[in-house]
A protein has these predicted regions:
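Single transmembrane alpha-helix segments in multi-pass membrane proteins
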Residues: 3-55, 76-81, 223-230, 272
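Loop-to-transmembrane alpha-helix initiation sites
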Residues: 11, 86, 133-137, 181, ...
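Alpha-helical transmembrane segments within multi-pass membrane transporters and channels
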Residues: 22, 55-94, 99, 141-143, ...
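Short loop segments and helix-boundary regions at transmembrane helix junctions
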Residues: 27-32, 72-117, 122-123, 155, ...
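Helix-loop-helix "hairpin" substructures at the membrane interface of multi-pass membrane proteins
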Residues: 70, 130-215
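Transmembrane helix-bundle core of multi-pass membrane transporters
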Residues: 85, 96-153, 183, 265, ...
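Cytosolic-side transmembrane-helix boundaries in multi-pass membrane proteins
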Residues: 165-172, 176-179, 251-302
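Transmembrane alpha-helical segments in multi-pass inner-membrane proteins
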Residues: 192, 196-267
Length: 302
């Protein structure tokens, strides 16, 4: 049971970076960025390939740079070519499939058999004992979360937040919304690629299809966290992303351990939860309308 708890915490922290990326793109910028799936694999592919070449630390930064480039392409399609945000994400995601294959040497998967990773480097120092993987995962995620909160409190960060709320107001202050959108999407995809990079070294493998459904899982984590903490501020939003990811991984671990629901059906269950959570305001309005309608009929009947 201790191993299950440890693994759930490790994966919860690692995938929380994706939830934070979606918090930035979906909640702050109000953009449905579908680049996430391909960008996650891009980060993992670059990281594993560079690590196999003997550069595990450099691999992390290379993956982040690759993710930033993917975000820039998506933003360029939206802001300069007028492609709708959803289509821009789909187009970039489709192109990333070939880029990811190229990064893996035109193979559908790649592994690190006995190779040195950032995790093994930490283990060799003796820091963290048996919990060294959890220690590194928590450190990277919490540091990224802190930096994101601090960044969104700067002038540029406030401009990005304002762009999601009211682009016209941003234009009135002589700022270019296209620039703030580009910065926001680059940062979001950098976080996604960072998650893929760390996960790739954690699992010591990457597969071309390993990013399938990541955007839905990330949204589920974000929604779970917001349900528990709310979304009144940026700080709470980032904490909610981390907490939601950990809770989701514990749910996954419980389902896997108890077999209450077949593990093969978990992504379907996740998709249903996300759909219901996103549709909740509309469902609530419909329910309120029906109650008023019934109350009006009852009054007429009396």
């Amino acid at each position: 049971m201790l191993i299950i708890t440890q693994t759930a915490l490790e994966l919860g922290f690692l995938y929380a970076l994706v939830a934070m990326a979606l918090f930035l793109s979906y909640r702050i910028l109000d953009i449905a960025d579908l680049t996430t799936d391909g960008c996650f694999v891009l980060g993992a592919a670059v990281s594993v390939t560079a690590t196999a070449a003997g550069h595990p630390v450099l691999a992390i930064f290379a993956a982040m740079l690759a993710g930033t480039c993917a975000g820039f392409v998506t933003a360029f399609l939206q802001t300069k070519l007028g492609v709708p945000s959803i289509l821009a994400g789909i187009v970039t995601n489709t192109g990333l499939y070939t880029v990811n294959l190229m990064a893996m040497g035109w193979k559908s998967n790649q592994s690190l058999l006995g190779g040195k990773t950032v995790f093994t480097m930490l283990r060799e120092t003796g820091i963290g004992g048996e919990w060294y993987e959890l220690l590194l995962a928590a450190f990277v995620t919490l540091l990224a979360g802190l930096l994101l909160v601090l960044f969104l409190g700067t002038r540029m960060g406030l401009s990005i937040r304002a762009t999601g709320d009211n682009p016209d107001m941003v234009r009135a202050t002589s700022l270019n919304p296209s620039f703030t959108i580009t910065v926001g999407l680059c940062l979001a995809n950098m976080l996604t690629a960072l998650s893929g990079a760390i996960v790739g070294q954690y699992q010591k493998t990457v597969d071309i299809n390993s990013g399938t459904g990541i955007v839905v899982i990330g949204l589920a984590c974000l929604i779970i966290g917001e349900t528990l903490l709310g979304r009144r501020s940026v700080k709470k939003g980032v904490i909610a992303a981390i907490l939601g990811s950990i809770v989701y991984r514990f749910i996954y671990a419980i389902v896997f351990y108890t077999k209450i629901v077949p593990v093969e059906c978990l992504k379907l269950l996740t998709a249903i939860i996300v759909a219901l959570a996103i549709a909740a305001p509309s469902i609530q309005k419909w329910a309120t309308f029906q109650k008023r309608k019934m109350a009006a009929r009852n009054k007429e009947g009396v």
